[in-house]
Amino acid sequence: MTLYQTEQQERVHLQQVISIINDTIHNTDTSVKEHVETLQEYKDYIWSNKDIDPHEIRSMRESILNHFALGESVIDKRRRLGRILDIPYFGRIDFKEKKNGANILPIYIGIHTFYDSQSKMNLIYDWRAPISSMFYDYELGEATYTSPVGEISGDVSLKRQYRIRKGKMEYMIESSLTVHDEILQKELSNNADDKMRNIVTTIQREQNRIIRNEEAHILIIQGVAGSGKTSIALHRIAYLLYTLKEDISSKDILIISPNKVFGDYISNVLPELGEESVPETSMEQILSEVLENKYKYQSFFEQVTELLGKTTQSFIERIKYKSSFDFISQLDKFILFMENNYFKATDVKLTRHITIPSEYIKEQFRRFNRYPMRQRFEAMTDYLLEMMKVQYYFTVTTADRNLLKKEIKKMFAGNNDLQVYKEFFEWIGNPELFKLQKNRILEYTDLAPLAYLHLSLYGNITQCRVKHLLIDEMQDYSPIQYKVIQKLYPCRKTILGDASQSVNPYGSSTAGMIRKAFTMGEVMKLCKSYRSTFEITDFAQKIQTNNELEPIMRHGEFPSVLQFENTEKESSGIIDLISSFKKSGYKSLGIVCKTEAQAKELAESLQTYTAEVYFLSNQSSAFVKGIIVTSSHMAKGLEFDEAIIPVSYTHLRAHETLSDL
């Protein structure tokens, strides 16, 4: 195979590969059409010949099934070809085996293998193929991979990465390390000097340590703003899918993300994942399902909105207490108190002649103390009936079993989760810490402790199907929420976020708090901020300082602070900035307001000027490029090429400063 060395040669090669893919697509389309026509011919023949003998029917059935299977295979091939047409590959290594006479083999790596039947060669190797492992596992120099015939050793003499979109190469880079982040790739592609190359190499080594960490059962990543933590976490998923492909697939991984928009936003970050989508859910959905969707509750978004608006100190105090470890400790003590005080055994008259004495029932309650409270009733019922059967030759019916179970359940004073939860606050002497909203709606901060109490009484509903759990925006979840996650998901976990980016400072968690909640976990820190320019990072540091953040000298324009006399002139200024954005060539502009109500009002105002403005609300389910107006809560975790933050001092409450926004 020809060794393409220059960027121009690589561009020519790319177009040659795309041309061959297009030819293959044309041939595949023809093959699909032929299979459809053949199946239709069989169908027509059967309909027009009613007197077909059984032997011919069996023969035709075999032929139809074969054609159907082949057709499905061809359709699947066509689908894969369609996927690689826009981005045929993203990496290349040149590899030479150690055996004598071996030639250097250029290996192009993409989301699917592509074999050219004309040249009888693999033009693209699947990123999961054994030979592709050297792209991820080795720098330049000696390398090995395990093939079906054994271990192959040799030398990697070249490593390249490409940014290809819609069949066009935007840039390529050469680096001994595999650089995962697009912004770092761009820096290297822009003829970066040795200093920047060293910085990028350092960042990539730090990221690789996280991506390839297979030892930690719980990996907690504390990353400052702009450190690329979300991208790293998703590449970690790709790496785990590759290295553990015999044990884990995409359906075995679950992502907990803050909202539907964020889930959609990250879904296209990894071309390496190919067609494998990873299931996503939210913390609210998990907690509500534990409680069997019985309760109406305030969403996290609604809680944040209330905190940003007019709220009471008592509301804040309720959130703060229920986000503390003292709260968890008291709840555990109360569950133990229930164990000793909520079960009052009574005699049960099973038949006219058989009565089970209360002391015997109480003894069995203690006997089965290894079971959660309500599971214990099942075990007690079965055991007591078995004893009656042995002692009295009693024939047990379903009605007898149901009666005894019902009577035992009545002896327990904790059958109503919500009532028990309310009694807990009376038990600790602070009944005012529990308050239902209008229409008996639970406050968001009560959802997790109620689920925790439910699991403690009913037993864990262990989600064994999930083999790896990824939690993003870790700071937005409280310790009690992590305790529920611990009960539900015993699997390995990757948890990431930034303690300084919480939208609810009263109910947030640091990496240390999360580690304490799980009683284990390895914490890894990312302090280098590179996804924003030095000027933007420096500007943000002046508003709210983060002493752990290390800005990278990637320069750009200084942020502008514009002053307006009133909101009308502010809107006019925003319209001018939108006009400049349209001419800039950038793809996304985020206009971020403090609350959703303010964002909606501004979006409606701007939409009279241009229909291209999109309002991203809590109800939105997809992230779109272009001009987006949204709230600070919804914008968290998203990235924009340009951003506008309208700050009207009429929106600031008396005690607030700019840093609170």
Predicted features and spans:
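Extended, solvent-exposed polar beta/coil surface segments
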Residues: 1, 658-660
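P-loop NTPase Walker
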Residues: 1-33, 40, 184-303
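Extended, charged low-complexity regulatory segments
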Residues: 1-200, 204, 208-212
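Generic detector of solvent-exposed, compositionally biased contiguous segments
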Residues: 54-73, 211-217, 222-224, 228-231, ...
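Short, charged/polar micro-motifs that form catalytic or ligand-binding hotspots
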Residues: 79, 83, 189, 193, ...
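Short, well-ordered alpha-helical scaffold segments within catalytic/effector domains
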Residues: 196-200, 204-208, 234, 238, ...
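Alpha-helical nucleic-acid-binding subdomain
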Residues: 241-470, 476-484, 492
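Conserved helicase motor core of SF1/SF2 NTP-dependent helicases
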Residues: 246, 260-276, 281-286, 292-302, ...
